[in-house]
Amino acid sequence: MKLESDHVIATSDSSDYTSEPTANKLSKRRKKVNYWEKFCSWVTSTENRLYVGWFGVLMIPCVLTAATVFIIAIIAAPPVDMDGIGVPISGSILSGNNIITAAVVPTSAAIGLHFYPIWEAASIDEWLYNGGPYQLIVLHFLIGIIAYQDREWELSYRLGMRPWISLAFTAPVAASVSVLLIYPVGQGSLSAGMPLGISGTFHFMLQFQADHNILMSPLHQLGVIGVLGGAFAAAMHGSLVTSTLIRSHNHSESESINKGYKLGQQHPTYNFRSAQVYLWHLIWQRVSFPNSRKLHFFLAALPVAGIWSAALGVDIAAFDFDYLQFHQPELKSQGQIIHTWADTIDWASLGIKVLDERHIYDFPENLTAGEVVPWK
C-alpha cells in the first residue's frame, strides 16, 4: 500500500511538472490576445476625446512626418536645383527668405517622376540638392489627407451616420491631389509641382495661367462660382439664422437671445419660415427652400461641386488638353479677329511667361574646352 501510494504521489507530481509550461504558454497567449483586443477596442472606440480609427493609425504617422520635414525644410533646407541646369534656388528662412517668400522648393527636373527616397541618393547632400524633401512631404501629406477622409467615413459608420461628411471632404482632397500629384505627372516632372509656401503658391498660380490660360476654362469658372457662391450662401444662411432666433422661455428679455440654445433641445432654435419669407421679399420667391434639409444640402453641394470642377480643370490642363477653353472669337469668313477684354488676360499671360523664362547660355566649344585661339 505504501508503494502504491508513493507511486501515485510520484505520478501526480510528474504530471503537475509537465503541465506547468503548457499553462504558462496559454497564459502568455491570453495576455497577448488581451493586449491586442484592448488596442483594437481603443482604436475603434467612440468614447475617446479624439477618434483614432484604423485609418487614423495610417494618418497620424504620415501627417506627423510631413509636418516635421516641412518645418525643418522651410527653416534650414539648402538651395535646390529645381530646373536641373545647375542654378540652385534657395527657399529656406536661413538662406535669406522671410515667412512670405520662404518655401519648400520642388524636386529637381533631373529626377523627373522617379521615386527618390533618401537611400536612392549617393549622400544626404545630394538628396537635399535635388529637392528630396519636397517629394517626401508631398507623398506623406497626400496619404495623410486621404486617410483623414476615410477616417471621417469610419467615424460616421461607427456613430450610425450617413457618409456625407467624408464625401464633402473629397473636394479638398481632389484639389490637393490635382495640384501636387496629377499636374506634375502630366507635365513629366515633379519640378512642375506647387512650391510649398506663400509666395510659391502665387508664383505657381501665375505660371499656371501663363502656360494654360486657366481663366478661360469653363471648369475653372464653375469652380469660382462654387467657392464664391458657397461663401455667399453660407453668409446669407448664418445671418438669417441669427436674425430669426427664437427666445427661450427660461430667459427673460433682458438677457441675450443667444443664450437660449442648448445642445440636443427638441424645439427649434430659429424661425425657418420667417427666414424664407424674408428671402421672398428680398430677392425672389423661387430662391427660398421648402425645408431646412434641402437648404443645407445646397449649402454643402455648391462649394463641393465647384472645387471638383476646378480640380478637373487642373487635371485637364496637366496633359495640355485645352480644347475646352474659350478661344479668341474670329469671323471665319473675313479672317478678322474680334477683340475683347480677354485680350488683356492674354497679354498679361505672355508677359508672365517671358519673365519666367530661364536664360541658358550656350558658349562655343573653343571657350569651354580651354583651347587657345590665335589672334588674327
Swiss-Prot record:
Highest taxon of source: Bacteria
Site-annotated residues for Stabilizes free radical intermediate: H212
Biological process per Gene Ontology, one example term: photosynthetic electron transport in photosystem II
Entry's EC annotation: 1.-.-.-
Tyrosine radical intermediate, annotated site positions: Y183
Enzyme class, broadest EC rank: oxidoreductase
Induction pattern: By growth in FRL (705-735 nm, 26-30 umol photons/m(2)/s).
GO cellular component: photosystem II; plasma membrane-derived thylakoid membrane
Keywords: Chlorophyll, Chlorophyll biosynthesis, Chromophore, Magnesium, Membrane, Metal-binding, Oxidoreductase, Photosynthesis, Thylakoid, Transmembrane, Transmembrane helix
Disruption phenotype: No synthesis of chlorophyll f when grown in FRL, decreased accumulation of some proteins up-regulated during FRL photoacclimation (FaRLiP).
Skewed-composition ranges (Polar residues): 11-22
PANTHER family referenced in this protein's UniProt entry, alphabetically: PHOTOSYSTEM II D2 PROTEIN (PTHR33149:SF12), PHOTOSYSTEM II PROTEIN D1 (PTHR33149)
Protein name: Light-dependent chlorophyll f synthase
